[in-house]
Amino acid sequence: MPKLLLLHGPNLNRLGTREPERYGRLTLQDIETRLRSICDAAGVQLCSAQSNHEGELIDRIHAAADEGVEFIVINPAALTHTSVGLRDALLAVALPFIEVHLSNVHAREAFRQHSYLSDIAEGVITGLGADGYDFAARAAIRRMGGQA
């Protein structure tokens, strides 16, 4: 069974209560439930993790390569704009990935408009709220050869 890894960066564990006017009212669990339904219907195993710590996310990316993960959907959150380490981890495992952001980072502060990951991603989805995760999962499934 193909495997898709869903990774969430810092502060995303606060979804639903953190700035709901910007990030929406769905919780991280709500988003994962939606994606699990999409993946189950396509015969894809969904693995997921969230961490507020860069090193834990890097360790999870490294482990993904050893676990047979074929594709990653990642919302690196604030690490988007700061983490060379996350970039290097993704390059090291050479797994395709889609970068997702709930808010439109290009309509926000200047420091949020640079990503250390976008140029090495298969694609970037930004500003579509939780729907962005759905679109990313479906695109990843198709790229793994499945139907979504």
From Swiss-Prot:
The record marks R18 as: Transition state stabilizer. InterPro entries: DHquinase_II, DHquinase_II_CS, DHquinase_II_sf. Pfam families: DHquinase_II. Keywords: Amino-acid biosynthesis, Aromatic amino acid biosynthesis, Lyase. One of its GO terms (molecular function) is 3-dehydroquinate dehydratase activity. It catalyses: 3-dehydroquinate = 3-dehydroshikimate + H2O. Substrate binds at N75, H81, D88, L102, S103, R112. The active site is at Y23 (proton acceptor), H101 (proton donor). CDD domains: DHQase_II. Its EC number is 4.2.1.10. One of its GO terms (biological process) is aromatic amino acid family biosynthetic process. The keyword Lipoprotein does not apply. Pathway: Metabolic intermediate biosynthesis; chorismate biosynthesis; chorismate from D-erythrose 4-phosphate and phosphoenolpyruvate: step 3/7. Homododecamer. Catalyzes a trans-dehydration via an enolate intermediate. Belongs to the type-II 3-dehydroquinase family. This is 3-dehydroquinate dehydratase. It comes from Halorhodospira halophila (strain DSM 244 / SL1) (Ectothiorhodospira halophila (strain DSM 244 / SL1)). The gene is aroQ.
